[in-house]
Amino acid sequence: MASNNVAQFAAELKMPAGVLLEQLQAAGVQKASEDDALSETDKARLLDHLRRSHGSNDADKRKITLTKRHTSEIKQSDATGKARTIQVEVRKKRTFVRRDEAAEQAAEATGNGQEAAEDLELQRREEEARHEAELLEKQAQELKARQEQLAREEAERQAREQAAEAERRRAEEEAAKKRAAAVAEAAAAAREQAEQERASQDEERAAAERAAQREAAKKAEDAAREQAEKARLEQEEIAKRRAKAEAEARAIREMMNTPRKAQVKAPEPPPKPAEAPKPAEAKGTLHKPARPAGETSARPAAKKPAPAAAAQPAATTQPAGPGGDKKKAGGKGGWQDDAAKRRGIKTRGDTSGGVDRGWRGGPKGRGKHQESTTFQAPTEPIVREVHVPETITVADLAHKMSVKASEVIKVMMKLGQMVTINQMLDQETAMIVVEELGHHAVAAKLDDPEAMLVEGEASDAPQLPRPPVVTVMGHVDHGKTSLLDYIRRAKVAAGEAGGITQHIGAYHVETPRGVITFLDTPGHEAFTAMRARGAKATDIVILVVAADDGVMPQTKEAISHAKAGGVPLVVAINKIDKPEANPERVKQELVAEGVVPEEYGGDSPFVPVSAKTGAGIDDLLENVLLQAEVLELKAPVEAPAKGLVIEAKLDKGKGPVATILVQSGTLNRGDVVLAGSAYGRVRAMLDETGKPTKAAGPSIPVEIQGLSEVPAAGEEVIVMPDDRKAREVALFRQGKFRDVKLAKQQAAKLENMLEQMGEGEVQYLPLIVKADVQGSQEALVQSLLKLSNDEVRVQIVHSAVGGISESDVNLATASKAVIIGFNTRADAQARKLAESNGIDIRYYNIIYDAVDEVKAAMSGMLAPEKREVVTGMVEVRQVFKVPKVGAVAGCMVTDGVVKRTSSVRVLRNNVVIHTGELDSLKRFKDDVKEVRQGFECGMSVKNFNDIMEGDQFEVFEVTEVARTL
């Protein structure tokens, strides 16, 4: 339709006619009313004006676009609880357009018109607002009036009811008064009539009650009968479905057990009209679908299974969602059937006409006999008893509850924690999740890990011969390391601090007669535990005894370790090249210790050797290999590795490093190992020369990296099948170790408290010990604890492997401890912090230097010993009584010297009657500091006046003497 006037054009543009008139006036087209005609020229002028006003008609106009960027940072915690900094950038964009002068003039020209139009628009809007306000006020008044009217009506109704109630009560009272008067006038007749009426009323009421009871009983009986009928129908329906499912499962088993060629197509049953199943009403929240067909149910089984169910081929039962049976009720397969067929098991040789072939359907017309399967939701929520171990993943927890992992993740999100499907949950959190989902959580203790490890020990791998593990033991400085150096052609002893071995060294040597693995143990008395570990891991012990020194304490200890472990001994009498060597004396001393040489009828070969010249080394190796042949050492090679931690340390760059002796099996790089409470994957494996190796067989020492923490020396190393089992056993052991440690600390606190109560104040020397390897740290701590006595005790605040860090200095500041670094150093930050806090850090590389200095420090903490030294004897010649002073003795110094600061004992007939201090010492009338032998003096004793002639004063001084441990 052509728009000839303003109103029609406004309707075409879908805008108010008044706004269009304002725009036409602004464009210079003078139109006064909506009925004014519009020409094409007027429309063109309006379009040109609108284009100019919006800046789209001038090609020469220039635009300036300004973009402001503002960057800020926010901190947000991720799922693991770590704070992450996120960069946030805010961009603001503004565009400025420079208009031409003609547009500005036109804008100025039309400014007055626009202002007028704006005034009109403002007035119109004010009028509309005023009108709306009036309407609102009117509505509020009407509402208020209606509420008042309702209130008045309610008050009137209540008043009427109250009046009616009062009138009724008044009438009742009057009637009662009249009845009372009537009863008073004719008591006998009224009483009889009242009794008859009451009896009739009671009979009527009793009859009504009996009728009501009969009606209620009838209704209850009908309801119970209906409920029982419904329950019976449900039980029959469930029994039919269970029988049908069992028949289908039996058919599946028979089909799977029958050879493919022998399978014959089952006869097709006549088509039956499908019945729409009754949808069961689910009560509560269900977290698992219905029971599988083969699962034993607590409900009674069906008495009459469907006869045709066994002959039918099995159909894949798929749980349907809510309302999933709508399409199946009519007997025709819907989208649920298609999805079931696509998800079905594709079985080759199936004769079911394509029911279970997925998208590979059979020939046409064969799929008509398939039956629609329905999901019957359980009528009660299934509450499961979930056993929760100490750690469990989200996926495993969901599997235990038979729910989807997303449900567990949702519950964790409600609890305020973001988790993934593979994230580990602790036992407490997992139990909360189980309770949130409506199940019963039970804290399940892990099975005994040792039992699990024992079960895994059985291996069918063949036993193959393995090299012997030989431990070299003996007293300190008897030449053990030098002997090994000659065998290995190395120079280890020259580089050891103080010339003594303080670590266990593990080496394997390839000799012409075979491979031998040597363990070099320390001989110092502090390393008892190290030597015990060496004897535990060994097959043969070489006992090194110096020919010029004989049997020493650590030699006896090594003999006892070897006997306790049942390990054969090979005695090497070293240093036979020295002039003062006496091998025969050594033999006699060893016989006294129970080590009898073969030449005396014993079983221990004695080999004289010299680590300096190499004499007798070949004979020693030959005897060792001979003993190994007698022992017939064998171990499986193609099996998971088992071994022993010989030594462990914390490297600053590599992390925890452990020296392991493989005892059986093969340790490969990448295996998951468990060592005590430490576990991890072997990231790198080095031999004793520092070269990387990929595998280590039995009796081969290697150094591995990748453990979670520094293991304790002497722990057993086992290769685990996966990270999860290793982590579970390690956490189990950590918990046990923590409980034992806390119990020991509690017992120690109680013991210390009782001892302090009984013996008074005890001095403590707090120490923090940091060592390079686990064995040295253990030996140093044990040696320092042995220095404790009843008055001064060593308190090990903290001991660990690794360098001295800031946390150690902070701990020393809090506990006022001294830090001892054994073959370790403090980093720059720790040194600065120690200097600022005045913490003493001592460095040692020889163990007995550390022990001696701590012993000296403890000696300084001992209370000094007080000793009395008699300096003189005085004889009382005369006694003077001085007022306000007391008794003053005139004395003669018969021996020694008397000092003013000395103490005295008063002797009478050589019996001590008083011990005290001098109050004054005078010679003539002058106070003096001392009086020597042969001079007279006047003396008074503090707080003692019972002085008689002939008494003697024994003068003595108390001196303090420093004590030593």
Swiss-Prot record:
Residues 94-375 are annotated as: Disordered. Signal peptide: none annotated. Residues 351-364 have a biased composition (Gly residues). Residues 267-276 have a biased composition (Pro residues). GO terms for cellular component: cytosol. Residues 465-634 form the tr-type G domain. GO terms for molecular function: GTP binding; GTPase activity; guanosine tetraphosphate binding; translation initiation factor activity. Residues 121-177, 192-253 have a biased composition (Basic and acidic residues). Residues 104-115, 181-191, 303-320 have a biased composition (Low complexity). It comes from the Bacteria. Keywords: Cytoplasm, GTP-binding, Initiation factor, Nucleotide-binding, Protein biosynthesis. Residues 499-503 are annotated as: G2. GTP binds at residues 474-481, 520-524, 574-577. Its main location: cytoplasm. Residues 520-523 are annotated as: G3. Residues 610-612 are annotated as: G5. Residues 474-481 are annotated as: G1. Residues 574-577 are annotated as: G4. It is found in: Cytoplasm. Belongs to the TRAFAC class translation factor GTPase superfamily. Classic translation factor GTPase family. IF-2 subfamily. One of the essential components for the initiation of protein synthesis. Protects formylmethionyl-tRNA from spontaneous hydrolysis and promotes its binding to the 30S ribosomal subunits. Also involved in the hydrolysis of GTP during the formation of the 70S ribosomal complex. PANTHER family: TR-TYPE G DOMAIN-CONTAINING PROTEIN (PTHR43381:SF5), TRANSLATION INITIATION FACTOR IF-2-RELATED (PTHR43381). This is Translation initiation factor IF-2. It comes from Paraburkholderia phymatum (strain DSM 17167 / CIP 108236 / LMG 21445 / STM815) (Burkholderia phymatum). The gene is infB.
